Amino acid sequence: ESTIEYITDQLIDVPDIATRKMFGEYALYCGKKVVALVCDDTLFVKITPEGKDFVGDNYKEGFAYKGAKASMQIDEDLLEDREWISKLITITEENLPEPKLAKKKIS
């Protein structure tokens, strides 16, 4: 089982979870929002104040790729706790801004 399959299996109770392959790695969506990236078999969850409060000291800041914004790098042992990781992803989705719609170019 691949890392992305394992993570999506762990998030089975979270509605509207989807993945999209990007640049050889994966973006994890909850609804229309990108809530995390999976790069080099590691989960990087977008940082929100509410997510940081929930996680406490259970993460280190990491970068999914060179030039990326800092994210919460989640250790494998924390991924095993389905309820915990589902709650973190839900909190993250609830506290991220709505994605901006791309403006159509007028030619």
Residue ranges and their predicted role:
Residues 1-107:
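Charge-dense, helix-prone N-terminal extensions
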